[in-house]
Amino acid sequence: MIRDWDSLKAAVAGGAQLKYIFFWGHRAPKDGSVGKSCFSQWWPSPFEINGVGYATAEHYMMAEKARLFGDEAACAAILQAATPAEAKKLGAQVSGFVEEIWQLHRFGIVVAGNRARFEQNPLIREFLVNTGERVLVEASPVDRI
């Protein structure tokens, strides 16, 4: 099972024939159903971790970034952000930010947020489960993480 970048590289190097789901964007299909855009950090899927509510996984990631660097004011502002774009903008202004430290923690933060949101939102959980063994790939042309 592919769980991270290293296991994906090993599977490809070993000749595994993998299937991928490429996604980008966070808007629902026109019919209102859940589609692959639910994998976006910006998809509206409220969840809680340790009694704190998050509107999107982007809010969680940016709040954790602020916590990691001890910027409680930024964390509070991120939690109140009306949109994931606003949360991302506030996250870019976290004081005390050190790229090398962020690189060590960001993957685990993203995983924790996504585990919580998929566990707590049955419709997107079902969509995720139905992807089977396919590898999810965010195909954003503008954002690496």
Predicted region positions:
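Charged, low-complexity intrinsically disordered segments
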Residues: 1-145
